[in-house]
A protein has these predicted regions:
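Alpha-helical transmembrane segments of multi-pass small-molecule/ion transporters
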Residues: 1-319
């Protein structure tokens, strides 16, 4: 039961920080400009530096090359979950301004702030390489395919909406966080190390990413009258996609793809994590339905109190 308690600690920390943003916003600390500033600060400054630091510190050239075969499972499972989400969005007639968020939520998870401590509690430090591998694929897909989905909801030009690499979409997709991620990968592949003072500075600023993202979710939640938070099909299906479809896609592909037993266990746990906190930030930045994104993120965190420990016990017993 100790590993379950450790997982709950991570979830309670998230709820607490979201609560701070919620309470301060209700007390008038933040206006529309403040929340936009937080979104911009995270997207343009702290998150790109966080990407560079996290990749540079957790990978080296040899480790990245050696673990390359294990990349196949997270890549295929996320693409499968994305396909299921896209079909579900059309079959169940998800609102147009929510479809990108809805589909992204199906295959993108909070793999670091919750995922890392959960896997450390369950499998120990030997799980860190697999955790970071899933994180790398998760991050790549979020800042390309995920952002593309969210951007599509904001484009009025029908021609632009039909082309992945349209000028309007590409300008938004090639964001500072994606640039930071690419820089981190290049540094690892070239076996380059930044000077310690620079890495320390990047880490200090990068550490702002998670708390600011969670405070932002609290701010967005405070703008929604509690009585108006309806559990409509868009929300319920989004939750089902996050906690059911994504992990099932991983489990369905395990017998058919080359992967170590430990990586299979870690990837399954990573797929069960709540929604990515930066999803609400991106929705705000690009003019999508940020209230829906914030509500979906917050709800998956709350439900994670029950769902994540349940999956931990199942994985520990059967996989």
């Amino acid at each position: 039961m100790e590993f379950v308690l450790k997982a709950l600690e991570g979830i309670f920390s998230i709820v607490f920080i979201i609560g701070i943003g919620f309470v301060l916003s209700r007390r008038g600390w933040f206006d529309e400009y403040s929340s936009a500033l937080i979104a911009r600060l995270v997207t343009a400054v702290s998150l790109p530096l966080y990407m560079i630091v996290s990749i540079s510190k957790n990978f080296d050239h040899n480790k990245l090359v050696a673990m390359a075969p294990d990349l196949l499972l997270p890549i295929c499972s996320m693409l499968l979950a994305f396909g299921v989400g896209t079909i579900a969005a059309h079959v169940f007639k998800i609102k147009k301004e929510r479809r990108g968020i809805f589909c992204t939520n199906f295959f993108i998870a909070n793999t670091m702030f919750i995922g890392l401590p959960v896997n450390l509690a369950l499998f120990g430090e030997k799980s860190i390489p697999a955790v970071m591998l899933y994180y790398m694929v998760n991050t790549t897909f979020f800042w390309t395919l995920g952002v593309h989905n969210i951007v599509q909801d904001t484009l009025s030009d029908t021609k632009n909406k039909s082309v992945f690499f349209s000028p309007a979409a590409l300008k938004k997709i090639f964001s500072p966080p994606l640039a930071g991620f690419i820089v981190g990968i290049v540094l690892v592949l070239l076996d380059c190390r930044l000077p310690p003072f620079l890495m320390n500075s990047f880490q200090y600023i990068g550490n702002l990413t998670t708390p600011l993202s969670l405070v932002f979710i609290g701010i967005e939640m405070s703008k929604i009258p509690l009585g108006e938070i309806g559990f409509d099909k868009d929300l319920l299906l989004g939750v089902a996609g996050r906690f059911l479809v994504c992990p099932v896609c991983v489990l369905a592909l395990v017998p058919f793809l080359p992967v170590t037993p430990l990586s299979a266990q870690v990837f399954t746990m990573q797929a069960t994590m709540p929604a990515m906190t930066q999803m609400a930030i991106v929705a705000k930045n690009y003019g999508a339905d940020s209230a829906y994104a914030a509500t979906l993120s917050f709800l998956t965190v709350l439900l994670g109190i029950v769902v994540v420990p349940l999956y931990m016990m199942l994985v520990n017993m059967y996989i």
